[in-house]
């Protein structure tokens, strides 16, 4: 049989994510805005990699956010999560972040979340 193993989409994403994570590092002054999306929900967290702490988090799985959304996996949900994460970051005094797209293409829900966070006041 063949020498090459077929690599599925998620494995390719994880390879891209590892490659990106070598370059993207969050500090206390400029923490990392990390995005994860599943088939049902979208998650965003702001992480200080020096300490290994999550400073702020938001997801479409949270009951108060989920109740306001018609769908938890739509672009509108991603935009709402982007606005929420930016508001929570401002409350903690965070204005500048490094964007970590998690190996996902910068398109669709990931782009919508990033654009909404920028509009709400986060700088990348």
From Swiss-Prot:
GO terms for cellular component: cytosolic large ribosomal subunit. InterPro entries: Ribosomal_uL18_bac-type, Ribosomal_uL18_bac/euk. It comes from the Bacteria. Transmembrane segments: none annotated. GO terms for molecular function: 5S rRNA binding; structural constituent of ribosome. Keywords: Ribonucleoprotein, Ribosomal protein, RNA-binding, rRNA-binding. It holds the Pfam family Ribosomal_L18p. GO terms for biological process: translation. This is one of the proteins that bind and probably mediate the attachment of the 5S RNA into the large ribosomal subunit, where it forms part of the central protuberance. Belongs to the universal ribosomal protein uL18 family. Part of the 50S ribosomal subunit; part of the 5S rRNA/L5/L18/L25 subcomplex. Contacts the 5S and 23S rRNAs. This is Large ribosomal subunit protein uL18. The gene is rplR.
């Amino acid at each position: 049989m063949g020498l090459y193993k077929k690599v599925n989409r998620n494995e390719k994403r994880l390879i891209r994510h590892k490659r990106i994570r070598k370059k993207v590092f969050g500090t206390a002054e400029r923490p990392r805005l990390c995005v994860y999306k599943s088939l049902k929900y979208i998650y965003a967290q702001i992480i200080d990699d020096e300490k290994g702490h999550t400073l702020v988090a938001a997801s479409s799985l949270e009951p108060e956010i989920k109740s306001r959304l018609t769908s938890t996996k739509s672009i509108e949900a991603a935009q709402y999560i982007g606005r929420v994460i930016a508001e929570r970051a401002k409350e903690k005094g965070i204005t500048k972040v490094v964007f970590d797209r998690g190996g996902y293409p910068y398109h669709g829900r990931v782009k919508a979340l990033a654009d909404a966070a920028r509009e709400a006041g986060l700088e990348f």
